[in-house]
């Protein structure tokens, strides 16, 4: 059976038998891979924590009939432990890998791989707030999938902006002529934040107030849900937690 190597980030795992796991990974060259890691649940496993979610590893696999088999794994990026120490970061990371799992397949996508690894690295280092990092990742990953939003010109007719009404079903901001009845009007600061998250304008993003961040997150969640057809479970948990903290504050 052919043997191959690749870099991969672990998206999720689930138990198989007494000691094995099926590991779902997004790889640099082979797209999404599902493979068996034999004996990984044993205390003395040679894989250790290298095949846990959010970890990036150099893996060697051989092709099986239905599932490939991991034979070696060496750590490239150990992000899991640092992310797990913070609940908001952990929830954000779960939403990221869930989105990546939904949006990728066996076709190689280097940009998808690099975007996810970069976002997990940023979370583990605490470079930006978890919510900002997640929202930026979701907007970018959806753009790579072909659903790039517009936060400047009208997403329907292209009329130059800025515009203040947002319709997620139409792809972002819309001009007065294209806005359907009842379209929500959004603060200019929120539009600016969404644009910054999409383009990596972190200075603008970090300067946004909590209410602006909350409004932007709600729109990003709605946009992701519209295009993914059903909501991300982890994103729903994060939104619920935000509402609870806002109510208690």
Curated annotation (Swiss-Prot):
Family matches, as Pfam families: RecO_C (PF02565), RecO_N (PF11967)
Keywords (A to Z) from UniProt: DNA damage, DNA recombination, DNA repair
InterPro entries referenced in this protein's UniProt entry, alphabetically: ARFGAP/RecO (IPR037278), DNA_rep/recomb_RecO_N (IPR022572), NA-bd_OB-fold (IPR012340), RecO (IPR003717), RecO_C (IPR042242)
GO BP annotation list: DNA recombination; double-strand break repair
GO CC annotation: bacterial nucleoid
PANTHER family: DNA REPAIR PROTEIN RECO
Family according to the record: Belongs to the RecO family.
Role: Involved in DNA repair and RecF pathway recombination.
Name of this chain's protein: DNA repair protein RecO
